[in-house]
């Protein structure tokens, strides 16, 4: 196990112990839902299987439940529910940020798509086109852009709803990339790779 992963896990472990009883309850609930998804979620099991077949098996301990930085969430227009660390290969699930187990399932699936892309396609996360492609795929394949999720966000569309959601969320994510100078650059990156990346559903046969 890499030293980078150990350092990242230790930092998250330290954070987990600082939030009092409420934080511990959130982390316990997160772990319970995570355990269920790793046993029963079709999308999670499918991605875990294909990651293993590709030589990138994901041990359960590499999927970490921990509190996320509330100041970062407050500064974002899209509250954070998870993340993927290219350096360590670990996935973070933000304990206390999920309104349902289905929400966690979509988040974990999203981050596993990033991990799949990182493993198979050697993504350069500082390259905006690379980042945009993985965000398009992760948002499209994870269930993040289901109509019910969009309604919960207060976004109601009846024409090309899925595509518009994927595009919007991909632009938001790329805009947050440290290498991205502004939203316009993020939009250009998403537009440049849109056709090929939206059509690429690997390892799924179709959009989940």
List the model feature ranges, each with a label.
Residues 1-28, 156, 160-208:
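Pan-zinc metallopeptidase signature
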Residues 2-101, 147-151:
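Auxiliary, metal-adjacent structural segments of Zn-dependent hydrolase domains
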Residues 84-92, 115-120, 166-170:
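Surface-exposed beta-strand-to-loop junctions
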Residues 91-108, 124-131:
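Short pre-active-site segment immediately N-terminal to the catalytic Zn-binding motif
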Residues 106-118:
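Active-site recognition of the HExxH zinc-binding catalytic motif
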Residues 120, 124-171:
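Post-HExxH zinc-binding segment in Zn-dependent metallohydrolases
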């Amino acid at each position: 196990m890499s030293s980078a992963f150990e350092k990242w896990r230790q930092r998250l472990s330290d954070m987990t112990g600082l939030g009092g009883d409420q934080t511990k309850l959130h982390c316990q609930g997160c772990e319970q839902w995570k355990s269920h998804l790793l046993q029963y979620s079709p999308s999670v099991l499918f991605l875990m299987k294909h990651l293993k077949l590709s030589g990138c098996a994901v041990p359960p301990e590499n999927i970490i439940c921990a509190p996320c930085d509330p100041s970062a969430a407050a500064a974002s227009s899209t509250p954070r529910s998870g993340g993927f660390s290219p350096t360590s290969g670990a996935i973070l699930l933000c304990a206390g940020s999920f309104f349902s187990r289905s929400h966690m399932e979509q988040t974990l699936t999203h981050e596993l798509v990033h991990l799949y892309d990182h493993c198979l396609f050697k993504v350069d996360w500082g390259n905006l086109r690379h980042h945009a492609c993985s965000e398009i795929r992760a948002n499209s394949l994870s269930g993040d852009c289901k109509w019910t999720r969009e309604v919960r966000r207060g976004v109601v569309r009846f024409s090309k709803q899925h595509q518009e959601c994927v595009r919007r969320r991909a632009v938001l994510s790329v805009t947050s990339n440290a290498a991205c100078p502004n939203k316009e650059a993020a939009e250009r990156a998403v537009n440049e790779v849109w056709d090929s990346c939206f059509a690429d559903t690997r390892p799924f046969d179709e959009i989940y």
